[in-house]
Amino acid sequence: MDLTINEKRVLAALIGSGPKAAEILAEKMDAALESVIQWAHLCADKGLVTLEKTVTEQAKLTEEGEKYAKEGLPERQILNSIDGSIPMSELTKNPLSKIAIGWLRKKNWVTIKDGIVFVNENTAVGEDELALKNPVPGTPACKELAKRGLVEVVEKTSWKIALTTDGEKIAKDGLDLREEVATLTREQILSGEWKSLPLRKYSIDKLPKKIYGGRVHPNQQILDEIRDLLFEMGFTEFHGSIVQNSFWNFDSLYQPQDHPAREMQDTFHLAEELPLPNGWEKIRDIHKFGGDTGSTGWGGEWSPEVGKKCVLRTHSTSLSIQYLAEHPNPPLKAFSISRVYRRETIDPTHLPEFEQLEGIVMDKDLHFGHLLGFFKEFFGRMGFEEVRFRPGYFPYTEPSVEPEVWVDGLGWVELGGAGIFRKEVTAPWGIDCPVLAWGLGVSRVSMLRMGLKDLRQLYKSDIDWIRASPVRRS
């Protein structure tokens, strides 16, 4: 039987004796207790020793408990300072009184009457005071001290180790206790010394221990792949705040304040407000009567106070329109991959927060065909060979479309919405050319790419799944 040098040392230390405490064995071997226990377990796995485990409770004083063991409990110290009686106003000047007064009354050591504290006759030393000198686990006094944070009860595990019949036989047959050599030097090889050295044996039939390095989360890998793809296609990335006022999240995108279109997404509303940007009056006029766009608008009233109210962004289109307002001149190609928030019921296909890819392209002479062509190119590079389009509706685009991709086993899967921004959206910011816009649920793209059936798995803290996921290279 192949044994390591430390396993042999354990067997040798047990020769000629019965069960031996691990502490005694460690002292005899001049080794750390934890190491000896580990080596003994290895011997036990090979049937050479037995281990008997015993768990006992030990009580030890905390730092505060040690202090009171020397000075006395707070109630005893206060009691000793009272000469028969004392006004409560004087007693409370002692810092210990905050702790002691309650215990003095609980132990019936004092009586308080008309603001005077009187010492009672029976103030004998209590069980808790005796236990403070020698706490015994499980006793009422020890439990009381533990509640006061003066005693800590800990479990101590001890081991007894003994040779089995097989272990005793191997030990008596003789053990080579020379240190095994794991690495040979050049001199040992050239001189032939290696032939007489006790070489450490290796099991070549055992798989090595897996080493897990740092890993990028599988979902993040796909987000990075999408980001790199759009960079290759000439896009610029933009960012924005999670918290948006209703003006940018709804009003600037031609969603009326008193219309069901505003309820298309259930929203997380916040108590805070943010100011409206310069030029907000143009949005007001467009909502009320169409402004100078030729539209009739929504009619009715429009409140700037409603526009100031904050929400967690329900879509990243709010970032797109802000970016366009800051960059109104064509040509422009930009995108954002952002977390958005909606009051969804959690199920395998819906979460209250998820990543959305938002993109915009602005240039003269752009038309709807360019938008469809972009999707075919983009999804093709993402590995979806078949793409089709269905008519859609969004308050801020016209015409609107919903792209779908074919997934084996699932059929056609809708991945987002797109269209050309309406004049009511772009005109207030001085934009007079077409703007192609889209928003895609990239969390769903990740889910399809990885073959998942439950969207929640993308965000679970499952380290084994992350380790087992293939590394994706863009």
UniProtKB/Swiss-Prot annotation:
State its cofactor: Mg(2+)
The record's keywords, sorted A to Z, are:
Aminoacyl-tRNA synthetase, ATP-binding, Cytoplasm, Ligase, Magnesium, Metal-binding, Nucleotide-binding, Protein biosynthesis
Give the binding site residues for Mg(2+).
Answer: E398
- Give the main location: cytoplasm
Pfam family membership, one: tRNA-synt_2d
BP GO annotations:
phenylalanyl-tRNA aminoacylation
Please name the GO terms that the record assigns under molecular function.
Answer: ATP binding; magnesium ion binding; phenylalanine-tRNA ligase activity; tRNA binding
Residues reported to bind L-phenylalanine: T317, Q356, L357, E358, Y396, F421
Q: Which SUPFAM superfamilies match?
A: Class II aaRS and biotin synthetases (SSF55681)
Q: What is a single cellular component term in the Gene Ontology annotation?
A: cytoplasm
**Record InterPro entries:** aa-tRNA-synth_II, aa-tRNA-synth_II/BPL/LPL, Phe-tRNA-synth_IIc_asu, Phe_tRNA_ligase_alpha_bac/arc, Phenylalanyl-tRNA_Synthase
Q: Which reaction does it catalyse?
A: tRNA(Phe) + L-phenylalanine + ATP = L-phenylalanyl-tRNA(Phe) + AMP + diphosphate + H(+)
What are its E.C. numbers? 6.1.1.20
- Sorted alphabetically, which Gene3D superfamilies does this protein's record hold? 1.10.10.2320, 1.10.10.2330, 3.30.1370.240, Bira Bifunctional Protein, Domain 2 (3.30.930.10)
Where does the protein end up?
Cytoplasm
How cofactor binds (record note)?
A: Binds 2 magnesium ions per tetramer.
- Describe its partners and assembly state: Tetramer of two alpha and two beta subunits.
Q: Which family does the record assign? A: Belongs to the class-II aminoacyl-tRNA synthetase family. Phe-tRNA synthetase alpha subunit type 2 subfamily.
Q: What is this protein called?
A: Phenylalanine--tRNA ligase alpha subunit
Name its species. Answer: Methanocorpusculum labreanum (strain ATCC 43576 / DSM 4855 / Z)
